[in-house]
């Protein structure tokens, strides 16, 4: 029984580390966005504000929606989604958008924190990635963050 307990503890520890990265990302992206804001944006690329607006849209339209789907449907099916920049509150500016992203991300992380064991075990089917449980969705969220952080480097 001890090896199983150690494995479960390891999985939980890895999940907690991913949740920590998800929660800390608003500060990480804020620093990167402020550094990038002083440089010209290459043609065809998003400005730092547009990247952060995109991250808001992804949290609202993808991450939070899929977590709600897991709670409401037996086995939800998800398509590939890559929303553009969040269009609301156009006058916010970079700092305002970063603040909004922090609030939205806090809500997303909160949705993960309220999951019980059954919630973490529920699964849906993604047309590209196959079966995903809540931890699989969390992995995708962290990977997506890192991808966009790299674009501001």
Model-derived segments and spans:
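Hydrophobic alpha-helical segments and helix-packing faces
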Residues: 15-18, 22, 44-48, 60, ...
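Short, contiguous alpha-helical
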Residues: 1-8, 38-81, 123-153
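Acidic/His metal-coordination segments adjacent to aromatic residues that form catalytic metal sites
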Residues: 10-13, 84-97, 128-136
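Acidic/histidine-rich alpha-helical segments that form the ligand environment
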Residues: 21-22, 26-32, 83-122, 141
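Short alpha-helical segments used as structural interaction elements across diverse proteins
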Residues: 12-15, 50, 63, 102
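Short secondary-structure transition/capping motifs
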Residues: 18, 52-56, 97
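Extreme N-terminal tail/first-helix region
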Residues: 1-24
């Amino acid at each position: 029984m001890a090896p199983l307990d150690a494995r479960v503890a390891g999985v939980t520890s890895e999940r907690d580390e991913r949740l920590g990265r998800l929660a800390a990302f608003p500060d990480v992206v804020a620093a990167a966005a402020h550094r990038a804001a002083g440089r010209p944006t290459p043609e065809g690329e998003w400005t730092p504000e547009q990247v952060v607006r995109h991250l808001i849209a992804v949290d609202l339209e993808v991450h939070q929606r899929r977590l709600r789907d897991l709670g409401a449907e037996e086995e939800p099916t998800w398509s590939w989604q890559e929303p553009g920049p969040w269009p609301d509150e156009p006058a916010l500016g970079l700092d305002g958008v970063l603040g909004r992203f922090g609030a939205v991300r806090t809500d997303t992380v909160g949705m993960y924190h309220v999951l019980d064991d059954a919630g973490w075990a529920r699964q849906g089917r993604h047309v590209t990635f196959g079966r995903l449980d809540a931890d699989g969705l969390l992995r995708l969220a962290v990977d997506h963050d890192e991808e966009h952080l790299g674009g501001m480097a």
